[in-house]
């Protein structure tokens, strides 16, 4: 996210969307392995597979959708749009890129500070996911407001959706499939 704030090249923004898609894929893959219903020994037990079938279907949907849509389909479509429009840079930002980098770093730091506040009611929330996702959402909203090109705004919106998806993984463990369906509708 900090790199997206620091550069004006749209191809680099699209490449960062690909990296975000792969990172979200690995977060989903490792995050679901910590779920109480998931156990490596259930692979050989057909009764355990049938008992956890709704969880397995949701897990497979989230994994496949994250990898295919977020890491391949949307970035490849945006690369094609960047090539056809010959819009290679967004140099019309309201704020110079150094200040964008500085403000994005402050937002990321503030996200980690907020995530590590010791409130007993928030113990169910994963602080790493919460801190990163809140920083991604706020930075994306901020970048959408200061950029002028439509492609930069679309990339900011998709990055914000990635942050919302990560936020749903940290807060609502049972509902990432609903969040993914909402993102697919966008």
Residue locations for each model-derived region?
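Alpha-helical transmembrane segments of multi-pass membrane proteins predominantly involved
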Residues: 1-186
């Amino acid at each position: 996210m900090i790199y997206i704030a620091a550069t004006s090249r749209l191809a680099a923004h699209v490449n960062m969307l690909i990296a975000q898609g792969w990172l979200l894929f690995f977060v989903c893959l490792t995050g679901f392995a910590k779920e109480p219903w998931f156990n490596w020994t259930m692979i050989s037990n057909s009764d355990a597979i049938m008992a956890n079938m709704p969880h397995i279907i949701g897990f497979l949907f989230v994994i496949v959708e994250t990898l295919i849509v977020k890491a391949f389909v949307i970035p490849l479509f945006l690369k094609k749009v960047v090539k056809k429009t010959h819009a290679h840079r967004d140099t019309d930002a309201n704020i110079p890129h150094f200040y964008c980098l500085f403000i994005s770093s402050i937002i990321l730091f503030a996200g980690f500070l907020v995530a590590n506040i010791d409130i007993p009611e928030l113990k169910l929330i994963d602080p790493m996911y919460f801190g990163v996702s809140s920083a991604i959402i706020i930075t994306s909203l901020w970048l959408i407001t200061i950029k002028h090109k439509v492609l930069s705004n679309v990339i900011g919106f998709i990055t914000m959706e990635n942050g919302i998806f990560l936020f749903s993984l940290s807060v609502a463990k049972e509902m990432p499939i609903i969040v993914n369906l909402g993102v697919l509708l966008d």
